[in-house]
Amino acid sequence: MSNNPRSIIAIVPAAGIGSRMGADKPKQYLMLGQQSILGHTLDTLLAHPDIEQVIVALHPQDNYFNQLPQSQHPKLTQVVGGGERADSVLAALDYAHNYNPGAWALVHDAARPCVTHQDITQLIKSVAIHPQGAILAAPVCDTMKRSDASGLIVHTVDRSLLWHALTPQFFPVSILRTHLSAALAAQVPITDEASAMEWAGVMPGLVNGRMDNIKVTHPDDLQLAALFMSQQ
């Protein structure tokens, strides 16, 4: 693995309840074909040759995870997550730091089952040009509008430098842990790992990822994810 970190630990925050899906269980456990969304996500991460370990942060009352076949995989570790995504990531980073403080964290959304090995490998290799860390992202293609508080268009936003932030996001375990912990202590709104790094003054790299790496958020996304996976 030339120019790549020696130890890569994937982190999957999976403690959320996914209320926008309106389902009877957390969205990561909804079926996508023959197995759950989370099952597909974990299969991809566990099978990647550069990933040494996968840490899944779970809700303390999770009654579903141990029913997944992936829960018994020797590369997989469970930790108790927190109330927000960032809290779950930090809990996993604490474990990863104790395991190997020199490792790199590959943080990936549980509800992005369409991520490919090609994109993961491309992100890992980007360390050669982005030693501070990087994220998968996709350029904004739609026309972007800024509104006022009443919902009226104020102006059209220049999209030439706008990107959709995707996952995985890839940073050194110890550095991300330090910055994420400090940002949460300062009550900074953290929506992804890159935002914690940005708050600390780090400028993460952007790695162009596939547009089919969608996050399953609404019911219609399940059919779209199934279509994308059938074409990969």
Swiss-Prot record:
The keyword DNA repair does not apply. The keyword Transferase applies. It comes from the Bacteria. Pathway: Isoprenoid biosynthesis; isopentenyl diphosphate biosynthesis via DXP pathway; isopentenyl diphosphate from 1-deoxy-D-xylulose 5-phosphate: step 2/6. Coiled coil: none annotated. Keywords: Isoprene biosynthesis, Nucleotidyltransferase, Transferase. CDD domains: CDP-ME_synthetase. Its EC number is 2.7.7.60. InterPro entries: IspD (IPR001228), IspD/TarI (IPR034683), IspD/TarI_cytidylyltransf_bact (IPR050088), Nucleotide-diphossugar_trans (IPR029044). One of its GO terms (biological process) is isopentenyl diphosphate biosynthetic process, methylerythritol 4-phosphate pathway. SUPFAM superfamilies: Nucleotide-diphospho-sugar transferases. It catalyses: 2-C-methyl-D-erythritol 4-phosphate + CTP + H(+) = 4-CDP-2-C-methyl-D-erythritol + diphosphate. GO terms for molecular function: 2-C-methyl-D-erythritol 4-phosphate cytidylyltransferase activity. The record marks R20, K27 as: Transition state stabilizer. The record marks R159, K215 as: Positions MEP for the nucleophilic attack. HAMAP family: IspD (MF_00108). Catalyzes the formation of 4-diphosphocytidyl-2-C-methyl-D-erythritol from CTP and 2-C-methyl-D-erythritol 4-phosphate (MEP). Belongs to the IspD/TarI cytidylyltransferase family. IspD subfamily. NCBIfam families: ispD. This is 2-C-methyl-D-erythritol 4-phosphate cytidylyltransferase. The gene is ispD.
